[in-house]
Amino acid sequence: MPKHDSLWLKSLRWIQKHLVHTIVVPQDPFADLNLDASRPLAYVMKTESLSDIAALSEITAKLGLPSPYEPLVANGVIAPRVVCLQGRKPLFGERAGNEPFLECFMRLLAVHKERPELDIQLVPVSLYWGRTPGKEDDTMKAAVFERENPTWLRKCLMILFLGRHNFVQFSNAVSLRYMADEHGTDMGIAHKLARVARVHFRRQRKVMTGPVLPNRQALFHSLLKSESLRKAIQEEAANKKISETQARETAIEYLDEIAADYSDSLVRIAERFLTWLWNKLYSGINIKGAEQVRQLHHDGHEIVYVPCHRSHMDYLLLSYILYYQGMVPPHIAAGINLNFWPAGPMFRRGGAFFIRRSFNGNKLYTAVFREYLDQLFAKGYSVEYFSEGGRSRTGRLLAPKTGMIAMTMNSVLRGIERPVTLVPVYLGYDHVMEVATYHKELSGKKKKKESVWQVFGAIRKLGNFGQGYVNFGEPITLQNFLNERAPNWRTELADDPEQKPSWLTPAVNVLANRVMTNINDAAAASSVTLTSLVLLATDQNALERSLLERQLDLYLTLLKKVPYTTYTSVAEGDGKHLVQQGLELNKFVVCADPLGEIVSIEASQAVSMTYYRNNIIHLFIVPSLIASCLTHNKQIPRQQVVSIVADFYPLLKAELFMGIKDVPAYVNQVLDFFIEQGLVVETDTLTVVPEHTSQLLLLASSVSETLQRYAIIFNLLANRPKMERSELESESHLLAQRLGALHGITAPEFYDKKLYGTLSVKLKELGYLADNQDKSNINRIRDQANSLLRPSVKQTIVASVTAEHTV
């Protein structure tokens, strides 16, 4: 290799500086990987390449990593900084042997034998000039831009045409000290290390580019030859008394309606547009947990992303983030309502496949869709779908629609070899464009049909939207889940493949709820959501600025010292910083007062801000319930607080998809936190410290509307034990409307009929709606709920239930 200060390399670096734009994966290798700045470091690359090393040199200078041109000097040892697995491919003839490169591996290992204190980190580095996966029927373009083993001439063309799409990916470091101690330092180990590195680079390329793309028409013909589709076409012909040719044409029409038409060229163009869009809209996008997903891809998992659904922006945001995190954007299941011009064709070429809201018993459509989904899994394409079935209008997670999850489960049961893993994804925003529309719809206005004019209308409103949040939750591997739920599932299916197992539907329901729980476990507590939570807990949606900052400091400390889960993310900075962020986004207003500034939510925005509060209400609902127990009792034993929370938690879990593993332990941790912060003292009982009562009262207010709902339900059950489930839902909803009208409750979810339906299902499951119900339990929970209400609210509920009962 020429010296790094030679005229040739200087010229090459100057050319690349103007032609090449490099994206680093991950963005911060020191934070995301196991790199240790105090230990010597060497790079391992697949192929010796002057242009690759020049590009790497630019990046290492920006990241503060050692330059690939500098020799590795450690403990008196001088070695090359870059180790390659193979030499450059010549324009003509054969590539030289790998012996010189294996010698480098052996030298690095050998010095560890001589110097026991030495530990060199070997960091794999992959470079990609463009990320085209190629096609099954590839053309001359593939020959010109052969990316894996290009000659210098092809590399020049790649830099010229694809230099703006260069990716450099760093991987976790390998300790050569560990390798030397565990496996030795001879040539055999050097060969083994090189083999492992080759496998790593091959897998890494697959993660970055994805599987080859099929020819769409060839894919259709392949699907139509499948056993299940041939059978479905025959049944369609027989049932509708048409020819098989006509039924086949219908199946092709369905495929054309459903199937994606992924275009790498469009994705590259979209990447530029979306970079401009995000920079215009957001001051930053916060990402947590991407490395675990990248590792799942690397380990050969079939990935199914299951995000929550807040906004139409969700379709773009997750794909964009995955692209920049070194993964292939997934094929996205989009509602057929989005298949309008020009968005529909663009979404389709960006990887969207379209699904009808209802299959309406259409067996042929069902068979076509199922076969297409199976094919995506079989070929290794990652998939994304929204299990809620639509965008949440309240900010809370919706009850999951199980159709897509059931189809995914069925694909596993039909024999996918690779592990299929669901990755729950929490998507959050400091500003959701559609919030105002959502509240119009909740108040009875008809939902507008999606159209190009809505797109233009949305573009006109683009502004400062603060930050976005993408948190990847705990993955669920379906084969492991099935082993847990039905240990003999493989044997059962082998014995009778056509028989639907009795455990399948309950297992799908449990899986769907676990996905939603894992989404909420990965929630992002941001400046907007936290400030909304505090201000909406006050009577006038306003608070003195210093008190607001103090309350936010309490919440931030709580989330950090008693973390809800390890997947949850918490805003950086203190309460003062969070308030300032919210004011800069115009979410809140501040007015001067002789005694100090007051921060408030404008009356016209109060209902809209409940959306953001609801994004994270589950993080604080148990601490809020604990605070309510403390503030409504002068003294209360610790165990009584634990018991009250245990009574309400099953309902909270059903309503808010909560995932606290050990509820008593969590309650005790929160109580210990309150004591540590000086809010509460404990002798034989727990007592609130008077000067901190206001902080606990504010926290307690966040659970008040939830307790009012439970008080309505349990007062009705206590007065009318024989009440049917449907009757309980309708009566609870009517009483909620009455309570809201009398006490000014405006939160949309308080009147949500579906919420009362969810609670009634859980009540039946817990035995509170059964004929042999334990009335003492119902009366106890009723009394607990009543004791935690304001007297006026309690009086309204008790009087209304009694009056209704006497009527």
Curated annotation (Swiss-Prot):
**GO molecular-function term, one example from the UniProt record:** glycerol-3-phosphate O-acyltransferase activity
- Keywords from the named record: Acyltransferase, Cell inner membrane, Cell membrane, Lipid biosynthesis, Lipid metabolism, Membrane, Phospholipid biosynthesis, Phospholipid metabolism, Transferase
Which GO terms fall under biological process for this protein? CDP-diacylglycerol biosynthetic process; fatty acid metabolic process
Q: Pfam families, from UniProt? A: Acyltransferase (PF01553), GPAT_C (PF19277)
Question: EC top class, in one word?
Answer: transferase
Q: Motif HXXXXD motif: where?
A: 308-313
Annotated localization: Cell inner membrane
State the family named in the UniProt similarity comment for this chain.
Belongs to the GPAT/DAPAT family.
Q: What is this protein called?
A: Glycerol-3-phosphate acyltransferase
Source organism (scientific name): Shewanella baltica (strain OS155 / ATCC BAA-1091)
Instruction: Provide the gene name from the record.
Output: plsB
